[in-house]
């Protein structure tokens, strides 16, 4: 996971020395908005936007889910990067269709030649203005949720105003402890930092499991944005985070209520097709040579996600 410094690519891993061994994630560098209003800089139009994703990445997975749920597959096209993220960062197996680039860092410098920062996915590109709209997944899914409704006719709302406070509270709790918590655990470089993140992670999972013992979903009786933001971490947990990131107190399959909830979400039409366990396992185990220097990718585990979820 390298970075750009004033437009020049550098193959450098995360520096945890100044943070006492703790992994600290950088903020997204592009945070503009598509808005359904006349005269706006970024208006919702069919075919105007292009999404760059990794099938391995939980943050990018969010955007693929919302693209599917909100009937945007015919309106926003996609480039999928290779699962291997080596010295050149995220790369394409074939030149991507807009500029013929083969590296994600070239997309960033296409938008801003002197860009400095990490080169991450997802990236939402605007073909009309030739720039990146956003590389912040939480904001891309909000745009997909609400700003294309007139175009698609799909008014399903995963961030309804009456539940917004609850959704935000869950998001604010789950992001540091679970979504980013698995990375804080796996990328920690001191025992103290690892154990701090590990304990917070499993405390949060215990809280979620207890909540799901009494509630159908996180914010109530309907699936919301908070559930999908949690899902993309849960679905990777037993496949990679338990072993690769040393998050091994319990598997998700050991949590009675979370496991049923995970299976229910996975079995919703179209969601399985956004989930690729080959890419997930290959990326983490093969790319993170500082954690897994042999680059051996495990054959297992066997995941039971398609049997009845038992949640009514």
Regions from the PLM with identified roles:
Residues 1-312:
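C-terminal alpha-helical interaction module
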